[in-house]
Amino acid sequence: MSKKVKAAVLTAPGQIDIQYFPYPKLEPGGGMIIRSLQSGICGTDKHSFKGESKQNTGTDSAFEAAYPFIQGHEAVGIIEEIAPGCFSHDYNGEPLKVGDRITFCPDVVCGDCYWCRHSSWYPWCDSKERECYGNSLSIHTPPSLFGAFAEYMYLLPKTYVYKVPDALSTDMATLTELMCVTYTLDKAKELFAFDGEGFAFGGTVVIQGCGPLGLAHVIKARMMGAGTIIVTDISDYKLNLAKAFGADIVLNSLKTTAEERISLVKQASHGLGANVVCECAGVPAVVPEGIEMLAKCGVFLECGHFCDVGGIELNMHKICAKNVRILGMNNHACTGYRPTMEMMLRHEKDFPWDKFISHKFSLDDYEEAIRTSMGPESMKVVVVANEK
């Protein structure tokens, strides 16, 4: 009898079903099978669970979540099998073998379109061949196991795979993809000029929303030499965690007005305003407030809207009046995985990393896991598929 693989399937918005699938058979050139260790629940997983399934709207690579499908892409796994002719090395040229612990980029790109050839460091691919693990591949596409919320997962031949350093714990490695998304702070720093533009050492950073993405930006801003870090959220639990990870000022949006928050940001920045505001809440209504918080020549980083949840009215004069730069964030750099893992190792003792993952659940309890992840007293929620 062939081995069966247990997986948590999102059959429709709000509906989870534990199902079993045949263990995949690899043909020559046919990719890789990993034994899933664990995967974090991402904001896009929550959006798909709620039925907010549109991504990359307005581009040639626009798609909707392919219900029914297996979610999970912030993953760490062990190489179980490698098809002949595939994956001799990882993205950085490190040799790969069965038994290696790896993570991977969720986006599988064609490698041949304009964007793949001109921006190979970033998954901009506009080809219809582009896929996204835990999102765009239905269980009706063989071999079904395209998400990490399963005991085993199948990786396509063009997947960018990254070997995890032996010294990095699986819990910390699970945060790699999330921490890669903070690279827009690096982009903001590139804009620095002595006339006051951009973000430099000692600059004031505001982070709107302190879920896992917001907390990752707190960590990155502190690593990059931010001066005052100010965080807004509606959960005291999350704001207290932000303080533990290096935030200087935390503001509960349910206990303060927008006018009070804007005033407090000005007071904390010598009356100038923030050099950078990172929108990580995924709530369109907070954007105008973030623009108001900026100093002249400030940079607004839009990091919280990977899914299309609608728009807002925005007075464009506010952008012009202060020479505001707006940087969108659709994804993360494929080149960022190894540097991110090395960066986390270097700063292993500088942050209470063990507090980042607040909950762990089994595959059988996936529905409870994703509902917990949307609550006010959780940070990164992880689903454990195999203990080792």
Model-derived segments and spans:
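Short amphipathic alpha-helix with an adjacent loop that forms part of the alpha/beta core around
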Residues: 258-270
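Glycine-rich phosphate-binding loop and adjacent beta-alpha segment
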Residues: 243, 248, 284-348, 385-388
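N-terminal Rossmann-like NAD(P) cofactor-binding module of classical short-chain dehydrogenase/reductase
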Residues: 103, 278, 301
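Short SAM/SAH-binding signature in class I
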Residues: 272-278, 298
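Phosphate-binding beta-alpha-beta segment of Rossmann-like dinucleotide-binding domains, i.e.
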Residues: 106-150, 189-198
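C-terminal hydrophobic helical "lid"/dimerization subdomain
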Residues: 2-3, 288-292, 334-388
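Glycine-rich beta-strand-centered segment in the early N-terminal region that forms part
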Residues: 24-39, 54-117, 146, 165-167
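Mid-domain Rossmann-like dinucleotide-binding core that forms the NAD(H)/NADP(H) cofactor-binding site
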Residues: 151, 165-255
